[in-house]
Amino acid sequence: MAVTRTALLVVLVAGAMTMTMRGAEAQQPSCAAQLTQLAPCARVGVAPAPGQPLPAPPAECCSALGAVSHDCACGTLDIINSLPAKCGLPRVTCQ
């Protein structure tokens, strides 16, 4: 019974979030909504096995990426870059 109530609550919350996001997208997509649309990029967002080439992004990924605003992209990268210090971890450097 508790599992059923929990499952129902999860479905209701997910439905409410979806409706809220759709309403926001009709006006001006929030940064979170823009980033959610990047799901088709997931398989190219993870480093391949050593020696394997990075797969080409699907057209859906490129389209979604083109719809992410400059402010959203830069703000997200700023947040990601600030996390190590906030977690007491060394700064990540990439080559």
Curated annotation (Swiss-Prot):
Disulfide bonds: C31-C72, C41-C61, C62-C87, C74-C94
Signal in keyword set: yes
GO CC term (a single one): extracellular region
Keyword set, alphabetical order: Disulfide bond, Secreted, Signal
SMART domains xref list: AAI
Localization, UniProt: Secreted
Tissue expression as described in the entry: Anther.
Signal peptide: 1-26
Family note: Belongs to the A9/FIL1 family.
Full protein name: Protein YY1
Provenance organism: Oryza sativa subsp. japonica (Rice)
Taxonomy of the source species: Eukaryota, Viridiplantae, Streptophyta, Embryophyta, Tracheophyta
